[in-house]
Each structure stands twice: as structure tokens, then as C-alpha cells.
Curated annotation (Swiss-Prot):
Top class in the EC scheme: transferase
Gene expressing this chain: glnE
E.C. number(s) listed in UniProt: 2.7.7.89, 2.7.7.42
Reactions mediated catalytically: [glutamine synthetase]-O(4)-(5'-adenylyl)-L-tyrosine + phosphate = [glutamine synthetase]-L-tyrosine + ADP; [glutamine synthetase]-L-tyrosine + ATP = [glutamine synthetase]-O(4)-(5'-adenylyl)-L-tyrosine + diphosphate
UniProt similarity note: Belongs to the GlnE family.
Name of the featured protein: Bifunctional glutamine synthetase adenylyltransferase/adenylyl-removing enzyme
Amino acid sequence: MSDNRLDTARRHSLFLARQLDNGKLKPEIFLPMLDKVLTEADFQAFADWGEIRAEENEEELARQLRELRRYVVSQIIVRDINRISDLNEVTRTITLFADFAVNTALDFAYAYYRDMYGTPIGRYTKSPQHLSVVAMGKAGGYELNVSSDIDLIFVYPESGDTDGRRERGNQEFFTKVGQKLIALLNDITADGQVFRVDMRLRPDGDSGALVLSETALEQYLITQGREWERYAWCKGRVVTPYPNDIKALVRPFVFRKYLDYGAYEAMRKLHRQISSEVSKKGMADNIKLGAGGIREVEFIAQIFQMIRGGQMRALQLKGTQETLKKLAELGIMLSEHVETLLAAYRFLRDVEHRLQYWDDQQTQTLPTSPEQRQLLAESMGFDSYSAFSDGLNVHRNKVNQLFNEILSEPEEQTQDNSEWQWAWQDKPDEEGRRCRLKAHGFDAETVAARLDQIRHGHKYRHLSAHAQPRFDAVVPLFVQAAAAQSNPTDTLMRLLDFLENISRRSAYLAFLNEHPQTLAQLAQIMGQSSWVAAYLNKYPILLDELISAQLLDTAFDWQALAAALSDDLKACGGDTEAQMDTLRRFQHAQVFRLAVQDLAGLWTVESLSDQLSALADTILAAALLCAWADMPKKHRDTPQFAVVGYGKLGGKELGYASDLDLVYLYDDPHPDAGDVYSRLARRLTNWLSAATGAGSLYETDLRLRPNGDAGFLAHSIAAFEKYQRENAWTWEHQSLTRARFICGTSEIQTAFDRIRTEILTAERDQTALAGEIIEMREKMFPTHPPADSNVKYARGGVVDVEFIVQYLILAHARQYPQLLDNYGNIALLNISADCGLIDKTLAGQSRTAYRFYRRQQHNTKLRDAAKTEVTGELLAHYGNVRKLWREVFGEEAATV
């Protein structure tokens, strides 16, 4: 067989050279293989597997599988050594072959024993039963090496018996099937071996049953599953086509419902065990298990899966490379770190394959002979082994450095920190503690009493053996962090409330122990804002955001965020509760991120409202799709439906706790459309406002729809237009000035924009309009007195600015259509001045006043600012707005 590719490859593989020299590879079969990526179709075409199964020719099946392996492995070697293929092709090809071999052997074994004993039948379902094979480890992640063994677990659906004359229990039947499957692949014959089969990852290992029912597997995982088995099952993949519930029952074992920072210590323990074995056996040259090796890259990917996979289904992946890429995409790891790990992983796996190509041995140890070393270096593109070794060490050092950064032991308490232990003692020196607390600016009596209350309280005394030491380690650090704030007592009280609240979740305590660098940041945030402190108490899962690379990144790409949210929702697989929780976690994370940035002074009030409004838009669009998909009895795939935002949402002036003023519209001639879209409106509202285990999203207000609470939940666009033209009150047209299309069908958006424009530009009697708006303002006084301390309802306050702008739009948009654009009140005052409708000086002063009011409202909410103090500055702002009011309306509203 003459081919330059073969000549190149055989220098680097004794195994390939033997196959070629012994005539084991027929040119007419092998050479065409070199020009393509092998698929299952190629494996199927290699032999008449159906005939072999029909004839129950076990010897022929074993021979053909082994011969096929010889061709597959040889093809992989030639293509890889000649750099025709890449790592992904290599690992996927051998994994696909493993899947094929397992299924082919299983089909044979099942048919063999079915003919002997009959078909296994489920005791409860009365349906035929099949064996599911779970590939673990590299086989599960499509990451097999050419000389890998395969880790398998056998699971069948339920107990029962076969229906043949020689009846057997399902357990016995599937045990026999499993044994024959193993023999077909694992036995060494004159033709070699297909795969070494390792069954030790099954429950109870070698001492456990070879096969388990799904119920037995679930019970084992719940009652006896160990931490290392979580990591093993993370890559578990069912490779057989038969119906099963394995994924559903394994998922909650692998991926915990809450952030699992306890996984750090479990992973460290596993790594220490491996490192100890490596050290004892002198395996420093092992590129898999040694420092900076393949296993450390895998551990880095898996630790984040273990911690966050229960919350982020997008992380419930099998492959190491795809997991690392997703970590970068989600902002959990820095992109440059992920690129470093991916480059190292590919390099190390390429080396691993070349070590195994040499003689088809499962080895990860670098060679010692000069000849083999030089060949290895050349196959990796280096001139010398020394240069190769340098390149290898660069990758290993980078991996090990990142591994140590991520999985190193928590920082030891420094001497500086240990000095604060006096604050948290079982039997404290009361007088000494009070003096020290006072010296650090605390209200000593208040803080000492709170610390004692916690130590002797029910929650602390009932902490687990794991949780209490973690709690004890955090308290002195909290005291130290609070002492650095301008309001140490308030800060510490909030921190201690938070600590007590999260103490029942040991994982959160583990987070604080694992990331002590976040404590100062946490204290600063809580010291600045009781609202943020309460938000964290309500959603402690947001602790995780403190270590996000995106926490202070103000570049919100809402299109990319919406796409990521969509992926997460799809990963829920139609699980409504999981989707609702996903929406809530996404929204809470973005709100918290914005609040932290806001406290850091990175946003103006207007810009922040733009971001909060964009967040609400994103949530509404995603929730609409989910609510429709969740709808029973619908008559079309895509709803002809839209959501319109009014009020603060429509005007893009949302605050952290604003509710959403919504109107639902549809445009669908179907006779059941009214009923269908009313149900959709009700369902969507529930998606937004319902409290789930992950919390809530928004309070909604639907009273601005036609006819208010007495009206339908959803209106046809025709009915909406008719109402606006014939029945709407002036105040409803005022509301329409701030309305905007949020999400839904583009045809409805076009129709709504047309209707809004036509209504707002309708010819009006300006005197009558002004009188109605003044009357509307007067009606507010009994329920909202115009006190100077209330910037919203005071004369010259927020409401007056809004009414002025609404009047200007309704009175003049017909002549000045630029007033129709929903830019917000500040911009519209400027536009009105440019149109000559109001005095430019008064417009500028009113813009300044409106900004001042919004800052006051915002700071009262976020920064614990006192209720508005009536100062000369505030009164001057009121005065300027009142001047503008009088210029526009000619008179002020009279107090009733």
C-alpha cells in the first residue's frame, strides 16, 4: 500500500506499522477511509450486522467488531499525524465507534437471551423492557482516546419477569445481557479487543449488582451517592435509544438546586487523593494526572458546573471544551483564561493521543527513550524534544497557575484578621469587647447585644458540624469589614441579619469562606443601602454576582443577554417552573448588578432607568414566548399578540421597585381569539407576578386598558382604536403620550404606532384641554396633598412637570410631530422650547428641577437618604416649575 500519508504516520506508530506490514488493512477499504470523517453509516456498512445477529454468530460478531476497530483506530492515527483532522474529530470518531460497538453488542446480547427466556416485561407498565447503557467519563463527553477503556453503567426501567416458557426475573435477564455485552467488547481474542470495559463506577462498584433498575439507582443516589460520584455522573450519557428516565433522576443528584460552594472542598479532596497517588508512584511526567495536566483542566470546568449547574442549565454539558466556552460566554470565567485552558487542553490531548498511537496502549506518561522522544516532538511540530518539553511546560504551568487560583485552599486568616476574634467568643470579655467596639465607631451596647443574641440563639446552636465553623470564621471578618464603613453599626446589623438568614444554607457560608475578598465589598454595599441589603436577604443567591467579572461592567448588551436568556430557557426543556425560576434569577442578577454599579456612581438616574426599562423589555419578550408555549388549546404556532407599556415603563423611567403598567392587544380573526388571548394575558401576568421558589419579577397594573378593571384583559387592535377615538377620557390620552410597544407581533406594533400618532395629533380645543388637565390635577389634592416635602405631588413637583409635558404633546403634536417621540420628559421639555412653545429659560430650569426630583426619589430608595428635606434649593425648583405651569396653563390648580 503506497501513500505518503502512511509513510509519515507509521514512523510515529508501531501499532499502525504492524497492521500495514501484516496486511491487516485492505487498501480498497482503508485508503477511501482516509479521505473522510467516519460516521455511524460507515460503521454500519462495514459488515452485515443484521445477518450476524439473525444467525446468532457470536464469534463472527466479535471478529468483525475487532476488525472494524483496527480500521477505525488506524484511520484516526493517519489523519491525525498528518494534521488532516483535529482533536474534535479524533475524540468524536472514536466515541461514535464506541457507541456503535456498545449498541451492536447489546442488540446481539438482548436478542440472544430474549430468544432463550422471552421478552422482559415491566411489573407495573406491562410493557417490554430494554437495557439502557450509560457511558461515563470521556465516553460520556465525546472525549474518548483511541486506547481508552470505556466506563459503563447498566440500567433497566423496572422489575418484572420475562414472558417466555423459561421465565426469568428482569434483574437476572439483564445481568446476563450485560455480561455478554462486556464479553463481546472486552474479551481478548486472536483479533484483539474492542474496548476494555470498566464497570467500577456503578453503585457500590465491584461489589454492587451489575445492573440496576431505575428505582434502585435513584434510591442509591439519594441515600448513598458520594461526592465523587456527582462528578462522574456529570458526564453520564445514555448511549442507547430506548425510553428511560435516567437523566431526570440523576440531574438533581449532580446539579444541586442551590449554588453549591461546598463543591470546592469536595473537589480539593478528590484532587489531593489523585496528587498523593501521583507523588507516590513518581508520575510527574504523567500529562493527565500530573500538575498542570488534563485532569486539572477538567476539574476547573467541572467545579463551575457543580456550583452553578443547578441554577444555569446551560452549564449542564458533557464535554470539557464546550463547558469552558460556555463559562466564558456566561462571564463566569475571563475569556483569556478560557482560551489559555483550551489551548493547553488541546495540546495535552494531542500529546496524549500520540503517546497512545505508538503502541495502542492506554498511557499518559512521557517516553524515556531518546528515539521515541524525538518522534513525539516531531509529531507535535517541534524540531527537538527540548523545544517540545519547553512548550509543554508552558501549557502545564499556565494550567496549574489557574487551577491554584480557582481551587486553592481559602486564604488563611491573617494576623490582622485574627485580632478581631475578640468580637466573637463563647465567653467574651464583656468590658474589653465594649471598649473595642466603641473604639472602632460602633454603638457598643447594641452590637454586643446582637452578637450575644445570635450566639445563644436557636439558629446558631442548630447549625451543622460543617456550617458552624464556617459561621464562626465569618463573624469576626464581618465586624472588621463593618468597622471600615462610615456607618459601622448599621452596616454590621445588616451583615449579621444576612448571615443569620443564610446560615441554614451551608453553601452560602462556604462561599463567604471561599471568597473572603468579597466581604469588604459586601459590607460597603450593605452599608450604603438598606434596600440592597434587603434585596440580598431576599435573594442570597446573588452573592455569586460579587465574583462575576461583569459586576462593574456597565456595557449591557441586551441583545446578547436576551440570547443567553433564551438559551437558558430552552435548556429547561419545557419545564414551566424551571423557566419561571430562570427568568427570575436572570432579572434579579441584572437588578443587583445595576444597583452595585449605581452605588459606585457609574450611572445617572436617567441612564439607569434606561437600563432597568431595557431589562423589563427583555423579560417581557421572553415571558411572552414562554407563556404562549405553555398555553393549551391554542389555534396557531405564533400568537398575534403584543404588549404595550404605559407609565414609567412606557416612558423609560423605571426604578428598582417600579410596577409595570401594561396593556395587551391582539389582531386575530379567529372566532376564539378573544378567549385565547385573554387566557394568554392572564397567564403572562401570572408569569410576571407569581412568587416561585426563586422569588418574583414585577408587580403589574392592568388598569390603563380600555374600560379599566371592567374591561377585557386583552383587546383587539380594532377595539382599542375604537375606544381611543370614541370613549377614552382626556387622562387616558395623557397616558397614551407615554405608551410604547414593548414586544409581540410587528403588525400590531405598526397599527399601534399609527393609532397613537393619530390620537395624539387629533385637533383639540386647547383651552378646554387645559381646563381638563387643571381639573385632573385638582382631583389629586384630597388623596395626595401638595406638601413641599413630597417631591412627587408638591406644587411644582414631579406630577406638574409630567402634566405640562402631556399637555404640550396633546395640544401641539399635530403641528410639531417631533413631540410624538417617546424620549422622556426631560428631552420633551427641550423639544418644546426649540419649537417655541415654552420659554427656553423656564424649560431649562424645569429640566434641572425634574432631574433633581428624580435623584431625590432615587436616593431615598437606594441610598437610605432621609425623606426630602425642604431646603431653599428645593423650593427654588418648585418655584421655577410653577412659573412654567402658569406660562402654559395661565392659572394654577386650586386646592379643594
